[in-house]
Structures are given as C-alpha cells and as structure tokens.
A protein has these predicted regions:
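Short hydrophobic alpha-helical segments used for membrane anchoring or interfacial signaling
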Residues: 1-5, 11-14
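A conserved hydrophobic position in a structured secondary element of the catalytic/binding core
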Residues: 3, 45, 119
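Glycine-rich beta-alpha junction loops
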Residues: 6, 15, 58, 95, ...
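Short, solvent-exposed recognition segments
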Residues: 12-93
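Juxtadomain coupling helices with adjacent low-complexity linkers
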Residues: 72, 77-79, 84, 95, ...
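Short hydrophobic beta-strand micro-motif common in sensory/regulatory domains
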Residues: 98-102
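Sensor-regulatory modules in signal-transduction proteins
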Residues: 104-107
Length: 151
C-alpha cells in the first residue's frame, strides 16, 4: 500500500488460499489512521508532514467510535510504532482481523510503501507473533534494499 493524502491506496495484494476475507484489494482506499499500513507510513514521515496532513480534528476518520481522533493521539500512536519497529491494527478495519506493517524506504529514507500481513484473530487482547513480525520486517528490508539498488 502507498500513502495517498490521508488514505492508503492498495497497489498489490497477495492472499493466502483459504485466508480471511479482506476489504483491502488493489485500488481500494482506506483511512491511513485506521490501518497498519497507514500507521507504518505515517510514522516514517517527518512530524511536520504528518501535521500538514492532519491539521485538526476534522481530518480524522473513526470507525464505530474507534481510531485516533486528535493530533495528540496520533503523535502518541506514531511514537509507539517507531519504538516498536512496526505498526499494528486490531479490528479497526474489519472485526476479528489484525494486521502488522512495516514501511519500505527509498535512498533518502522516505517511505514509499508498506508491506503488511493480516490474519484472523478473535482474541480480546490479540497477540502479535514474533515470527510474523520478523517475516514482515525482513520482507520490508529486502524491498528497501531493492528499491535502493542494492543486492
């Protein structure tokens, strides 16, 4: 997915056979603040660019009263993403599904896109599997190397 204004735009999807039904598909746009891909991309941007994208409360989209609703809440969430090294979303886009995402960066360290994994997770307090995180981080690192022209 890539950032397109305040939304993420899905440009490539690879689905597991028998996997959960996803609302994301090539060409679909979703609010960046509700998705792991969007949060990963926003966390990799300079703070002033994030402020320009989300200048006030009217810039935020919530789903069923959930999701960030202010610049303060968004900055806090993006700081958590940076500290953790990946973005996570539990049930904001689709109930019962969780996602993690990591940005792909260009030679200037600017985020170009994000790679993510989504899985069915009905737990009250979903746990993110370290092996899944590692796989997504390795995929993003490899794509970053390729974008930067390194083998």
């Amino acid at each position: 997915a890539i950032l397109h204004g305040r939304d993420v735009l899905y440009v490539l999807e690879q689905r597991a056979p028998g996997g959960p039904h996803l609302v994301s598909d090539v060409g679909v746009r979703l609010p960046a603040t509700l998705t792991a891909t969007g949060l990963a991309l926003l966390a990799a941007l300079p703070a002033e660019q994030v402020r320009a994208l989300f200048p006030g409360a009217g810039a935020f989209v919530q789903r069923d009263g959930r999701g960030v609703a202010s610049g303060v809440a968004l900055r806090s969430q993006l700081q958590q993403v940076r500290a953790r090294g990946y973005a996570v979303e539990h049930g904001l886009v689709t109930d019962g599904l969780s996602s993690i995402a990591v940005p792909i960066r260009d030679h200037t360290d600017h985020p170009l896109a994000a790679v993510a994994v989504t899985w069915a997770d009905r737990a009250e307090d979903p746990v993110v599997d370290d092996a899944v995180v590692d796989s997504v981080q390795r995929a993003a690192a490899e794509l970053t190397r390729r974008v930067r022209g390194r083998r």
